[in-house]
């Protein structure tokens, strides 16, 4: 089984002119099931979709390597949270990176999901961006960030992504792909289990039986009340 394309030359060898999806990841491309990018890309390939991969982009040209995907960009930080990959518990910069060629550090940015998504939204504002992986999953709600020592908003809000997938993404990525391919707008994908999406407050409709957490503006206040609300949420 050949590797999936990470260069235009390799895409041409597949006979493709345009990919359906471009995966942007903070790790090197390793086609092994211990890597989320490998699993998601092969699941999509098995479902009949053309997938190209941009590992550890640095310049605008890296993001633009394959041009606009037909359906969406898919973004993850890699196998682990980018801040955990970069810093020790003592907040010291790590000197190596197990998920980068040669073990060298510095090939992905801090808070990679936010950085990658904002760049893609700047370059291709009309193309949907779906985020997933461990960093997106564990930061999908307002969360305490050890390195900033404060509560940060959901990574979905900070990044500006259209859709967040959490947990085992292979369980819902094909449904997302099929519905986008059928012509549905990304904003209409509001009924897929294992996903999060943002709505304007004016458009919010309470869901019967759902637990509603306190707003970020309340849980992020560093006083006793805010901390209690955060713990409850």
Question: Could you say what each language-model-derived stretch is?
Answer:
Residues 15-18, 151:
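Active-site-adjacent bridging/hinge elements
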Residues 36, 55-233:
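Glycine-rich beta-alpha loop elements in corrinoid/cobalamin-binding modules
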Residues 12, 38-43, 117-120:
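Histidine-anchored nucleotide/phosphate-binding helix
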Residues 30-31, 174:
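Loop/helix-junction capping segments adjacent to catalytic residues or to phosphate/diphosphate-binding pockets
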Residues 9-12, 23-27:
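Long, low-complexity, serine/threonine- and charged-residue-rich intrinsically disordered N-terminal tails
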Residues 1-15:
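Short N-terminal or domain-adjacent regulatory/targeting segments
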Residues 19-25, 32-70:
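Nucleic acid-processing catalytic cores of prokaryotic defense/repair systems
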């Amino acid at each position: 089984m050949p590797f999936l394309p990470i260069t235009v030359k390799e895409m041409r060898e597949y006979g493709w002119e345009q990919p359906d999806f471009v995966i942007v990841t903070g790790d090197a491309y390793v086609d092994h099931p211990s890597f989320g990018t490998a699993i998601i890309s092969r699941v999509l390939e098995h479902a009949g979709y053309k997938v190209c991969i941009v590992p550890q982009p640095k310049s605008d040209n890296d993001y633009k390597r394959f041009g606009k995907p037909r359906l969406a960009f898919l973004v993850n930080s890699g196998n682990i949270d980018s801040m955990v990959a970069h810093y020790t518990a003592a907040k010291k910069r790590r000197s190596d990176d197990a998920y980068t060629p040669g073990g060298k550090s510095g090939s992905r940015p801090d808070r990679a999901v936010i950085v990658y998504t904002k760049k893609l939204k700047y370059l291709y504002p009309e193309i949907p961006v779906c985020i997933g992986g461990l960093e997106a999953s564990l930061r999908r709600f307002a969360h305490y960030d050890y390195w900033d020592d404060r509560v940060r908003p959901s990574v979905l809000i900070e990044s500006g992504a259209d859709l967040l997938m959490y947990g085992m993404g292979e369980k819902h990525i094909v449904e997302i792909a099929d519905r986008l391919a059928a012509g549905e707008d990304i904003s209409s994908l509001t009924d897929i289990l294992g996903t999060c999406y943002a709505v304007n407050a004016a458009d919010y409709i309470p869901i019967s039986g759902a637990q509603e957490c306190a707003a970020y503006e309340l849980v992020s206040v560093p006083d006793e009340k805010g901390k209690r609300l955060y713990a409850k949420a």
